[in-house]
Amino acid sequence: MDFPRGLLVAWTLSLWPGFTDTFNMDTRNPRVIAGPSAAFFGYTVQQHDISGKKWLVVGAPMETNGHQKTGDVYKCPVTQGNCTKLNLGRVTLSNVSERKDNMRLGLSLATNPKDNSFLACSPLWSHECGSSYYTTGMCSRANSNFRFSKTVAPALQRCQTYMDIVIVLDGSNSIYPWVEVQHFLINILKKFYIGPGQIQVGIVQYGEDAVHEFHLNDYRSVKDVVEAASHIEQRGGTETRTAFGIEFARSEAFQKGGRKGAKKVMIVITDGESHDSPDLEKVIRQSEKDNVTRYAVAVLGYYNRRGINPETFLNEIKYIASDPDDKHFFNVTDEAALKDIVDALGDRIFSLEGTNKNETSFGLEMSQTGFSSHVVEDGILLGAVGAYDWNGAVLKETSAGKVIPHRESYLKEFPEELKNHAAYLGYTVTSVVSSRQGRVYVAGAPRFNHTGKVILFSMHNNRSLTIHQALRGEQIGSYFGSEITSVDVNDDRVTDVLLVGAPMYFSEGRERGKVYVYNLRQNRFVYNGTLKDSHSYQNARFGSCIASVQDLNQDSYNDVVVGAPLEDSHRGAIYIFHGFQTNILKKPMQRITASELAPGLQHFGCSIHGQLDLNEDGLVDLAVGALGNAVVLWARPVVQINASLHFEPSKINIFHKDCKRNGRDATCLAAFLCFIPIFLAPHFQTATVGIRYNATMDERRYMPRAHLDEGGDQFTNRAVLLSSGQEHCQRINFHVLDTADYVKPVAFSVEYSLEDPDNGPMLDNGWPTTLRVSVPFWNGCNEDEHCVPDLVLDARSDLPTAMEYCQRVLGRPAQDCSSYTLSFDTTVFIIESTRRRVAVEATLENRGENAYSAVLNISQSENLQFASLIQKDDSDNSIECVNEERRLHKKVCNVSYPFFRAKAKVAFRLDFEFSKSVFLHHLQIHLGAGSDSHEQDSTADDNTALLRFHLKYEADVLFTRSSSLSHFEVKANSSLESYDGIGPPFNCVFKVQNLGFFPIHGVMMKITVPIATRGGNRLLMLRDFFTDQGNTSCNIWGNSTEYRSTPTEEDLSHAPQRNHSNSDVVSIICNLRLAPSQETSFYLVGNLWLTSLKALKYRSLKITVNAALQRQFHSPFIFREEDPSRQVTFEISKQEDWQVPIWIIVGSTLGGLLLLALLVLALWKLGFFKSAKRKREPGLGPIPKELK
């Protein structure tokens, strides 16, 4: 249906099913049908339909019939009443000597849905053959009315003792004594295996005439035959008509009671030549034609007693015996000696027993046919695990006959060298259908190579097989292939999944079991993982039974149920796996344990069947076998509740107050809550279901913004009855008062559930039971309700440029600063030594419409740490930053949440501290403004501000020097011996200490030491140089040793200052790296060269060692003074006798006297030598005496 504009429908959860321990199989009301536990009632179970009435067919393979444990099958009504034994264990197979004790009838059951018949098998049914019992197995078919209709025994073959033996006995007068002949008869008859399907014996006595002592079918046991033979009297006669007796036996004895196909054996016993020997040739020819094997016994008593040569007699008897004579001819000395040939005669008659070279003679004797069974279109597949020396086989019984594949047909997958492994092929049988190959049979061999194997094959009427594919197990002893099930998930008559059980798979120290999943892909089954059992590690034998069942959860896909009969301490459990599309979901939808159904259940899950609706409610039900019980689990209908919610009006306009609530103006709205139930099963399209629901407003807020008119912010436990397919709606009135947050929508939550979850319909697994819909606030923007902001961000820092630093800090004029900045990039900014922070002044302005959820994103380079944000104005707008420890160099700040108003502006200051651990040659600060409202691209360029500066750092260092020698006086009597033959020693130290915040690098220390004059005279010798920092690398340049040892005359009085500008020097250059507060010292150790200092001409001499700090070309550090330097000066003075010439002394004296005379003359001319007399002023008194 179409809803009006503004309808909000909840997003439902995915329909893909999830996990649950309780779904739609009812565990509260099971039907538990009890039977005899000792009979293993429940070992197999099948659902059965007879004219609409539902039954369970339950196998009890250890059931007793009379004194024998034959096993049997019960029919059980599914609703009420007791089970009835069908007495199929009393069924007898004629014409065989059968043994029915422990034949395990009901060990396998197979139903035929076409005619509602079923097959119950007795794989251990056996019959007697000679000295052996052959366990060939047998199955009994019952019709739809549970009545026996047919015996199926394809492995049953005629015994090698299937013989009709006629003894032709000479009873003429010459036979004596007769009692010895009777003893011979009794002894030889006791060696015969007489019984149905084995040996029949008839006796003909002849002389002059021939009579039947008894016919072949007169007696069916050794006891009866021996009893009858013991009463045979000698009939006598004067003639011995052996030819007549043989013909009589051939033509009459083999016809009266003889069996078709039975081997004909004739034993002729006589004591003399025949009176009708001319007829022997014809008689023997007729016997050969009838395939009568003849054993002839010549009794020589008559000849020996009379001393007659028996040669002619013996030749006649040999002629009567079949060829070769050595195997068919016997002679004894007399009648008493007949007892001596009993064993030999018996052995020769049965010489072929057990050694027949027919290819199947040893193949099917122990086949145990019916160990597994499976109904197909044209017959029945039967597993024969004991066939071919227990390698196993699969036989097929059809209306046209039976198909028994040759042993060689299996050799491709079951090679001869592994025949002693007892593969047990046929342990389970099933079939699959592919679009290309049609029906393909599947059989498991769980003991093949100890790991198990499954083969997929086609069977042909010429007894050959075509094996299409083989699947192999992975673990020794896991019994892979002991259970196999094919699944047509989507019901398109093509198999989608093949499941293979390995119930003894060992995992986590337990026999947990495993079920392998194979999907059909291009007519081959491809491994696709395993089904999941419970996570409780126990001996469960998960996969002992796997059943493909009809759609249980009514989603149109067939499902699978897996039994774990040993789980939960042998109480047992079953797992229900749902089908989906062409797959079986790996995780169980429901796990049902025996303990939750009824007390005392054991081995629950040993058999499973689910194909019929047993209680006429339109749903498929489950039948599960347990030890001594059969359990019926009823399916519950599945319903889907579709919930929807819409509001009138569709948005909350807090600027429009249209009602009063609790005396306050409010905005009133209505919510319409609607439910539509959908039953998945067609049978329930007119059903009803009751639900209960709760409604809550703004459930996740401590103070809800919306309230229900009925009071509060929620109401609970409302009940409503819904009809299938019909919509039911309810109006819920609510209101909104003033709120500060009108950006986030108001959430309206509804939780609903079935009114009676334990009975009636079941809510579909995975179907949502919660509906959350939000009603938004009107945003106050233009008519299309789409806000378009225009954010403008501006930012600048307080860092000085190189020019500003030069003028303000260094105090230089602009002209000098122009040349100062030439060594830097014009974009370089200077970090003064006292600076620890960087400040950014910024403004954010919204020149457009409201910006909802506006944010300011702040990020900085790693050498900065965010310190603070200070708002600079008193506007209503605010900025609040969120601390995120995981994002150290990023910060997100909310601007005037929930929205930044149109035409609003906010100014703020950002402070960043320099990092103590990260040092970079640049810094970067990025500011970006954004919001949930969409800004036009044409105005988005000014939403960001990027401050990126290349930096130079002002180094703050303390640079000092000290020296052990500052002045030395060279005296004439100065001796070198007191100075180790060199001169006075000195020790200079230059110390540099980093007083700043940043680590210093890219700086060199250059020390120049004057070593000698330009004339080659040594001034001092540098003996050693070292530093106190191991990470300081230094290079020394210049020659400090190769100067002349004898000084030459050189006058230094005109240039007494000796330094790097006028002397040969040694230069020491070191790379300097200093962490904050770290210091390093440079040490120079040497001696003044006294020999030269005494020889050179000077009065006073100063030798200066200079140390200067120099920045490298790309160094990030600068100094306030250009290349700061420190000097150490050695001041040297010299005492010496000066010889002045006489003419200089005389000239100087006369010159001095002349100069004195001229000075006196000048003073005289000026009146310097006259007395000064003052005139007294009038009025003055006399001059004081003291003044005079």
From Swiss-Prot:
Pfam family, one: VWA
Cytoplasmic side: 1165-1188
Domain VWFA, residue spans: 164-345
Transmembrane segments: 1142-1164
One example GO MF annotation: metal ion binding
UniProt record, GO biological process: cell adhesion; fibroblast migration; integrin-mediated signaling pathway; substrate-dependent cell migration
Matching InterPro entries: FG-GAP (IPR013517), Int_alpha_beta-p (IPR013519), Integrin_alpha (IPR000413), Integrin_alpha_Ig-like_1 (IPR013649), Integrin_alpha_Ig-like_2 (IPR048285), Integrin_alpha_N (IPR028994), Integrin_dom_sf (IPR032695), VWF_A (IPR002035)
Stretches of the chain found on the membrane's Extracellular side: 23-1141
Signal peptide per UniProt: 1-22
Entry similarity comment: Belongs to the integrin alpha chain family.
Role description: Integrin alpha-11/beta-1 is a receptor for collagen.
UniProt note: domains: The integrin I-domain (insert) is a VWFA domain. Integrins with I-domains do not undergo protease cleavage.
Name listed for the protein in its UniProt record: Integrin alpha-11
Organism whose genome encodes this protein: Mus musculus
